[in-house]
């Protein structure tokens, strides 16, 4: 799985995170996992107890596999019936999606597993999503539709982990948008915890200095990196990294 190393001097433990909105992906654990119904099927029940039971089962499996974090629930919006990942997103209704996700987060948390709600935000199209896909919306649409599931999962579910999106919001990379990562998520909604990017270095536009300064605390890298992606050594950059470390350890 994706890992962070232990740092004994500050009491940070080694962690392993895994992908899979409907299971614990065995590409990472090398162990079999129960596959559950797709998120859209769970949402069709309108039953938050069912969503909780799903999260609870994921948490039990993750705990048995020594998995710390789960890259899910995925909770973007069904903007079209032909959306490429509608199967792993709950609904076109942000309130329904948010309540389902919050219940799943709470269920997983019962077993010490933190759930990364994703992809924050407006990652509602697969076509060219990793190629600087600029998404435009007014503030009312953002808050009432596209942000709503995440807001509910933060406030009701108490999630301590978020995965940011590949998409651009207007002309700015979502993970590098301080108005999203800090102002809305932390200042307005009261989120405490870490934000990790979607796959990092898979797209040429991703810049570690930009995202860490914006409030995106970690970069999801699937290969060994001999040195940090952070190349700026100013006082501001160092303070941003300290803040990111604090957020990661809180999660």
Task: Annotate each language-model stretch with its function.
Residues 1-251:
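Glycoside hydrolase catalytic-domain context in secreted enzymes
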């Amino acid at each position: 799985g994706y890992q962070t190393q232990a740092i004994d001097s500050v009491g940070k433990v080694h962690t392993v995170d895994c992908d899979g909105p409907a299971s614990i992906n065995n590409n990472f654990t090398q162990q079999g996992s129960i596959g559950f119904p797709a998120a859209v099927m769970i949402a069709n029940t309108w039953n938050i107890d069912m969503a909780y039971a799903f999260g609870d089962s994921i948490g039990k499996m993750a705990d048995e596999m020594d998995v710390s974090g789960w890259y899910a629930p995925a909770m973007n919006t069904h903007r079209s019936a032909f959306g490429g990942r509608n199967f792993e997103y709950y609904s076109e209704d942000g309130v329904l999606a948010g309540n389902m996700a919050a219940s799943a987060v709470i269920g997983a948390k019962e077993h010490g597993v933190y759930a990364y709600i994703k992809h924050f935000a407006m990652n509602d199209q697969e076509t060219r999503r990793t190629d600087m896909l600029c998404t435009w919306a007014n503030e009312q649409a953002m808050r009432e539709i596209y942000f709503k599931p995440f807001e509910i999962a933060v406030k009701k579910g108490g999630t301590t982990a978020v995965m940011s999106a590949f998409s651009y919001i207007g002309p700015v990379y979502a993970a590098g948008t301080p108005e999203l990562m800090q102002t809305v998520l932390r200042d307005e909604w009261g989120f405490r915890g870490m934000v990790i990017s979607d796959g990092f270095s898979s797209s040429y536009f991703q810049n570690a200095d930009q995202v860490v300064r914006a409030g995106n605390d970690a970069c999801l890298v699937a290969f060994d990196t001999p040195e940090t992606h952070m190349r700026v050594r100013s006082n501001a950059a160092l303070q941003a990294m300290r803040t990111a470390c604090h957020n990661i350890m809180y999660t």
